[in-house]
Amino acid sequence: MNPATMTRQLSSDGRMFASSIITVIPDSSPTAAEAIELSSPLSLPSPTSLLDFLSTSTSRGPARSDTDGDKTQGKEVLDTKPILENSFRRENRVVSGTGGKAATGKKLKRRTESPGNVCQSEIHIVPGERIILRQTRPDKKAAKAKRTKKEDGLINRKLYGRVSKANQTVSLQPETKKSAPKGCNDTTQPADNGHINDLDDGLQLEQAIQRRLDWTPTKDTTIPVIDLVGDSPSSCEKSLSGMRSTRTMLSNYEFSGIVGTLGGSRSEGTPDAPTTKRPVELLKVNNLKEISGLSDSRQSSITEDSESATSKPRRVKAKNPPKSKLTTITSYATAKYTVVEKSVDLDPVETLLSDEPGKEKNVAKRTSGARCAKPGRKKSATTEKKNEPPIFKVVPPLEAFKAFDGQELLFGTSSQLANGHSEDRHEQNEGTSHISNSSAFIPLSRSESSSKAPSQTSLGSGFLKLSSSKNLWSAGARDLTGAVLEIDEIDLSEHWMKPSIFESQPKAPLGCKADTQIPPQLGEIDFDNSCQKPLAAIDPPELVTQSETPSEKGDLHKYIVKPTHINSCSQSGSSISVGSPEKPVQDKPIFSGFTTSELAKKVAAYGFKPIKSRDKMIALLEKCWENRNKTSNSVPKLTPGDGLSQVDESTQGQSLGQHLKPNSIPQTATTQVPKVKPDKRDTKSQGVPVPSRRSTSTSKVSRKRTESPSAILVDDDQRSDSTGDSVPPSRPRRPSKSCTPRDRQKSPESFNLPTIPLTIRSGKIPSTGTASETLPSLSTQITAAIKAQPRLRAFNGVKQPTWYEKILMYDPIQLEDLAVWLNTDGFERIGEDREVCPGLVREWCESKGVCCIWRKQRGVRAHCPLVRA
């Protein structure tokens, strides 16, 4: 058979690899080819079958096969080696077998005719019964390359493996898409294939760079802009220039390029606008441009009108930012404490709550002036004041703890935890505290007059600048028999009505207690009215008896005068005329209708310590009031001690004011009244004042008698408040404790009653004033005692907070408990010898903004001061 025929048959049947066709081309007759049967198109024939096939083929044509085989054996092996080296990493495959005889030098070869087959395989029969399969390239490779060259010259390079993967994608694209990059690079295809490859190698690098730039995201975004502008895509240079032009166009809308010009134009358009409304970073630029704008505006009035019109709405807009400052929680919380920002409507409230109303008014004027002033500059001044940093700062914890040491106790809304306190009573307390803080101390002068004369060591405590402090020890100190002890000399030079009050208090020993009676706030009586009445009605002989305990302020002394004292004092023999002795009985207050706090005040006014039971307080007050009225009815017969021990000072002042006669004032002016401390029994029998010498001796004797714990303590030092300082009182821990004999020793000196001023002076008064000035106020002493309290040990695992810790935690403070602690333990730690009463403690709490309550109230009637701005 013809080998060509066998070649066609094998080409149709024998495909041994997926990528290429391996053809067996023996030189035997074609019938032998038919004997070869491949198991599968992708598998090689077995060696035995090939040997059988070859053996048959060689037997048919031995001469031709031998000659050809010898030639081909040496030739093909040498020829195929270099070709196999350039193959696609396919190793030579050797098939060895032990089949029948095989003719040496036989060569089986077939060429693939299909253009898709790039490589063809050959089987070489080598002597030694081996079959070698080799791959060789077709001889007509150049012709096939020319066919592919027409489509694209890059395909050959792909076959050789010289090109990157990117080139493969380009070769697969249609010619229309390739035209753009060719146009950009301005390249032409050469006719020669080798020249094309060289040129492509050089251009591929440039195209790869450009395409890589195109692949970046930034370049992709700019490409559509170039299309919109209409740049021709033919040349890359034009496209780049178009991109740059578009960038410059877009840059006009960017922030960096336009801010300076716009800011200058705005400033030129509105030269009259205030500088505060302009950005801070553009002030210098705007100022320079404003000058040119002003010159331009002068040239044309129309521009000025337009500029003014534009500037007005801008000014209105500038007013809005300060309003937005109050949108934070901190601004709302602190707005009420900033005085400048408060409106004029709130000024009356501020004046009521503030100790210095004058300052509030000034602030109100400032705010009103700021509102009236509409110009931008004035308004900016007010805004600068408002924008000033607050007084308080957020400091580190260590500095905050240090600040507590030097900080006075002042608390805000904690005082409103208990709300039982009525507004009327609060206003009354505010007024009394304000008066007490003032230098005049007018409402307190009554108690001050009685307490001022005694020495600093005398009984009673002068509570400086605290009206309630005068109330606790206002009752006179008494001995075992109930007689009132005399007090030191008092200077009443400040008021002409003071000596008359003292005359109404006939007994020198009684004067001490009478003078220290309840201040107007505690007694809840209009002392001013009651004071004026008794002064007009005082008899001249009665003035002599009263020389004992007048205070420097006549108004208070009037109130303090007790009818019992007047009755008991029968020193001059002249009796005080009482208009109607039954009136005090009619004026008997209904103690059951009083609040517990009011009852406690009245009990404290008599010199008794606080009583827990409300019923006991009512019974005690009723008994004291009845005893006082009885003594007033039988004035000439009563002993000094009987009525004084249970007298209500506030009511005594009223009764005296009604019954005293005014004739006594001129007579007392010319007379010298010796301060007498006669024995209580002697005063009863005599009814006439004893000379000063005798009074001194009797006072010494009475001192010894009066040194007993049963007498009631009196606040003698309240008189010193008029001078501005408090006198250290002896500690009256028992309500019945008597005044110390020191009071008598200081009082036995005679008083000189001047004509019109009616002032009683003693040589010891200046010394008392100087000594009292050195003493610190009880308010500061209370603060120091509370801070000096050490930490308490836990009781049964429960912590016991100190008073200072309770205040910091806004716990309502019980006035009675705090007063007891101060009198027992608190003042001892700081070396204070004076004592305080719950009323004084309440005044201290109100001044410091501490929430305080009375013991039995349980928050119903809480005496908590409102927050003071």
UniProtKB/Swiss-Prot annotation:
Modified how: Phosphorylated in response to DNA damage.
Species annotation: Paracoccidioides brasiliensis (strain Pb18)
The protein's name: Structure-specific endonuclease subunit SLX4
UniProt-listed InterPro entries: Slx4_ascomycetes (IPR027784), Structure-sp_endonuc_su_Slx4 (IPR018574)
Key word Ribosomal protein present: no
Bias-annotated ranges (Low complexity): 40-59, 688-700
Bias kind Polar residues: ranges: 165-174, 294-311, 647-657, 664-673, 765-774
Known partners and oligomeric status: Forms a heterodimer with SLX1.
GO cellular component: Slx1-Slx4 complex
Biological processes per GO annotation: DNA recombination; DNA repair; DNA replication
Disulfide feature: none
GO MF terms held by the record: 5'-flap endonuclease activity
Lineage of origin: Eukaryota, Fungi, Dikarya, Ascomycota, Pezizomycotina
Bias kind Basic residues: ranges: 312-322
Main location: nucleus
Renumbered residue ranges of the record's region Disordered: 40-79, 92-116, 165-199, 293-323, 351-388, 418-437, 630-774
Similarity section: Belongs to the SLX4 family.
Compartment(s): Nucleus
